[in-house]
């Protein structure tokens, strides 16, 4: 006799549950070699696409105006756009350089520009326009106009050190010696000139002030012989002209070893000043009744900033 079975159309209890359990717990099918290589290739393409999205934009071609927009015609890099410019003629070592430069830039910035043109370090430069150009003032403040000539005097560091190291020692010795002496204006050789009194055409003085050299010669002074003397600063030739009634001495400023000065007792708004033209004090050329406001400008113009190196 056949065993009794389930009625037609009815499933035996538990069959679906067991099938689902078998399907869930069946181990993953092993991946063959071809499928593994395909997966690796797809990953590499995704990685390459990601890297490509991070690449920088291609550089502008050489002739592209956008690449040249930051380069101005004669202006400072990164400086002149939107600023008022003046045309300057910078003259150094008998060579003229025509440049455009912002009118509101300082003397210090002008030195940096000169450095970029000539290679002369700023500390070695003596920059002159109607006297020494102040580093902390703008070209507008010192009334520089378009077409102005800017004179530059300077030497290499090695040349300056070779010339000035002995000079520094000589200056220190001279100062130490002066401290031991009585004031210069009391010494007999100076007293005989000072006792004449002020020259009738002496220039006005401004006590406690420092001014740039005037555009005209300094006059109304005496020399050690009591004769009238005038000083003319020829900046373009880098010369000091010492003029008397008899003749005019034209001295290269680089030949002047030192400049000393001292206020005149009882007339402290005037100085007596000497230019050292040789190796000893005997070579001093004395000038009396120099207005005090020009003393520092004379020293800076003749000796330059590098005198302290």
Curated annotation (Swiss-Prot):
InterPro entries: UBFD1, Ubiquitin-like_dom, Ubiquitin-like_domsf, Ubiquitin_CS. It comes from the Eukaryota. Residues 9-19 have a biased composition (Acidic residues). Residues 174-185, 192-201 have a biased composition (Basic and acidic residues). Residues 35-57 have a biased composition (Low complexity). Pfam families: PH_UBFD1_C (PF25343), ubiquitin (PF00240). PROSITE patterns: UBIQUITIN_1, UBIQUITIN_2. Residues 1-80, 171-204 are annotated as: Disordered. Disulfide bonds: none annotated. Residues 84-159 form the Ubiquitin-like domain. GO terms for molecular function: cadherin binding; RNA binding. Binds polyubiquitin. May play a role as NF-kappa-B regulator. This is Ubiquitin domain-containing protein UBFD1. It comes from Homo sapiens (Human).
